Regions:
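Conserved short alpha-helical segments that host acidic/polar catalytic motifs at enzyme active sites
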Residues: 1-246, 250-251, 262-290, 302, ...
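Glycine-rich oxoanion-binding loops at beta->alpha junctions
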Residues: 67, 71-84, 270-283, 307-343, ...
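Acidic/histidine-rich
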Residues: 156-187, 454, 459-485, 520-522, ...
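Active-site phosphate/pyrophosphate-binding segments
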Residues: 260-264, 268-293, 383-512, 585-605
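Glycine-rich phosphate-binding loops that contact phosphosugars or nucleotide phosphates
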Residues: 287-428, 432-436, 516-559, 580, ...
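Generic C-terminus detector
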Residues: 539, 552-554, 564-605
């Protein structure tokens, strides 16, 4: 990850590539590079850091003359952000250069195979196996080499390929990662999204999974995975540049909400091999562990609260969830029998780093769950699992939260099997439920087209209460946070059973109460709380399954969620609450992507 561009035509390629990469900056990245064809060689330049540094290094592209080239911005997934790990990558013989957006799931076995055949690896990336496979399979027929290489890859990839034997040609390949061709006059472009294209052309061809394209300045031929020609229509791009960056969505937050099914799938898929869970290179030693402490801030903390139930239920180990800003000052009862789980999207959250260091100084082993490769927390940890959520631009997290939660679910099942605290029958049921989360998330989006209308009803509220029990309460915490941080409406969450211990005094005529009722085992109890607040004039917006007819009859309004195992329900329940907060904020004219007084990464105490 995170974006690729390519050009072949009459212009100098490097300035076009640099400009295209700048248009992809919004996606987030930690390094960048370009490769330009120069007669019988490929010139490559890459840097760690900003595209401005790459432009400076190449004198805005002037130092890399040539009319055919490829470019890349990287968000590290395999290997730290370094010049060596940055793309493009070159083959040992210098004949090929490749840029890649995605994740190659079987790269370790391919890497070992290629090393055994004498190929030398310069980087730690999964991408480098691609360029060596191309070299291995190339026998003078570039199309065949591309097809044979693609057939060996498992995972997601959008590729741009240069070969010195055909200096005006680029091959572009798509599998589960977006790739769009831009059609000009005597020139052709490609990019991960239209943002990088609209300054040059409005004519686009969208590749589908399993397709690849052979590109020259005057010629575009698209093939299916068997090498058979495919006819594709040219689509006229009507978006402006800003809209293109947002994928046609009005806000980044909405885009990221809608991306969650695919983001969670990207988190899950590489970690599930058949019916086994493989947590990257994190062979977590649970010997002697008698307590698990989860520490984080903000939404990451609430992800820990939601996952606590699954970990305790399956692993039979007590789990404490602690705010990092409190844990660091609390003289915690932590020692070598404690596993510390540290959650942070950025991996740079100041309070979380400080709490982590304090616990490690007392003997705890630390498992980090972060999104940014090479971040401080990932380096401090004994083990690290990356969420692979991709860049999240909106300040209010959505897919960052759900991918953290997904990794915690993976850990719960992984640890339970390792500790032998789960029988094979339940393990099978929960594995099926885990794999179903992306589909259920999409269903939760599809089931609630009327959330915008609900927002029109509730957006003038001065305060909102969110209630639930067990995992529903954990979701209520995050739902209330989403509402307050982007709509600026005072929103608080309460354990439903605690209402009568004080909070019910605040209920008045017309007071909005969002009641989560997604756990059948405790739905009756939550329903009694709904009756209590309704008796005092509250307007109840219930979150429940369509099959729960009694709640339908009690609530003033409904948000529906599909049925899923209650241990994993939080990842599905939260999605419509994110949408509710989004639409309420939109009704109130708030700056949704950049709420006032908030920052994406809190790197100070």
């Amino acid at each position: 990850m995170c974006g690729i561009v390519g050009y072949t035509g009459q212009q100098q390629a490097a300035p076009v590539l640099l400009e295209g990469l700048k248009k992809l900056e919004y996606r987030g990245y930690d390094s960048a590079g370009i490769a330009v064809m120069q007669q019988k060689k490929i010139a490559i330049s890459k840097v760690t850091g900003r595209i401005a540094g790459l432009a400076q290094k190449t004198d805005d592209g002037k130092l890399l003359p040539g009319t055919t080239g490829i470019g890349h911005t990287r968000w590290a997934t395999h290997g730290a952000p370094t010049d060596t790990n940055a793309h493009p990558h070159a083959s040992n013989d210098g004949r090929f250069a490749v840029v890649h957006n995605g994740i190659i799931e079987n790269y370790l076995e391919l890497r070992q195979e290629l090393i055994g055949k004498g190929y030398h690896f310069e980087s730690e990336t999964d991408t480098e196996v691609i360029v060596h496979l191309l070299e291995m399979y190339y026998k003078g027929d570039l199309k065949q080499a591309v097809m044979r290489t693609s057939a060996r890859l498992k995972g997601s990839y959008a590729l741009g390929i240069l070969c010195t034997d055909q200096p005006e040609k680029i091959f572009a390949v798509r599998e589960a990662s977006p790739l769009i061709l831009g059609v000009g006059v005597g020139e052709v472009y490609f990019a991960s999204d239209v943002t990088a294209l609209v300054a040059y052309t409005r004519n686009a061809i969208y590749l589908e999974d399993g397709e690849f394209a052979e590109l020259t300045p005057e010629f575009i031929q698209i093939y299916d995975c068997m090498g058979r020609p495919v006819q594709k229509k040219v689509t006229r791009i009507t978006w402006d540049v800003q809209a293109a960056e947002k994928g046609g969505y009005e806000h980044f937050m909405l885009k990221e909400i809608m991306e969650q099914p695919s983001a969670v799938k990207a988190t899950l898929t590489p970690r599930i091999k058949g019916n086994e869970i493989v947590l990257d290179d994190a062979d977590i030693d649970l010997t002697g562990i008698r307590k698990i402490v989860i520490t984080a801030c903000g939404s990451a903390y609430y992800a820990g609260c939601a996952a606590k139930f699954a970990i305790e239920e399956l692993c039979r180990i007590p789990v404490l969830v602690e705010l990092a800003s409190e844990l660091r000052y609390s003289n915690p009862l932590i020692d070598s029998s404690t596993l510390l789980i540290v959650l942070s999207q950025s991996g740079e959250t100041a309070d979380t780093i400080a709490a982590m260091k304090e616990c490690q100084s007392r003997g705890a082993k630390a498992l980090a769950i972060v999104n940014v490769v090479g971040s401080t927390i990932s380096k401090l940890a004994d083990w690290c699992i990356y969420t692979w959520a991709g860049p999240e631009i909106a300040v209010a997290t959505t897919k960052g939260y759900t991918t953290q939660l997904t990794v915690l679910y993976l850990f719960a099942l992984y640890a339970a099997k390792k500790l032998q605290t789960i029988d094979s029958s339940l393990y099978g049921i929960l594995m099926s439920a885990l794999k179903a989360i992306p589909r259920k998330m999409q269903e939760s989006l599809d089931m609630n087209p009327g959330i915008g209308k609900l927002a029109k009803k509730y957006h003038k509220a001065s305060s909102m209460f969110f209630i639930g029990r067990n995992t529903d309460y954990a979701v209520a915490l995050e739902g209330a946070l989403k509402m307050k941080e982007i709509s600026y409406i005072h929103a608080e969450s309460y354990a439903a059973g605690e209402l009568k211990h004080g909070t019910i005094a605040l209920i008045h005529e017309g007071q909005p109460v969002v009641a989560l009722c997604c756990n059948d085992a405790i739905t009756e109890k939550t329903m009694s709380n709904i009756v209590e607040v309704k008796a005092r004039g509250a307007e109840v917006l219930a979150v429940a399954g369509k099959e729960n007819q009694r709640i339908l009859s009690l609530a003033d309004d409904m948000i529906y969620v599909p049925k899923i195992h209650p241990l994993f329900s939080a990842a599905v329940e939260i999605v419509p609450l994110q949408m509710l907060a989004y639409h309420v904020a939109k009704e109130n004219g708030c700056d949704i992507d950049k709420p006032k007084n908030l920052a994406k990464s809190v790197t100070v105490e």
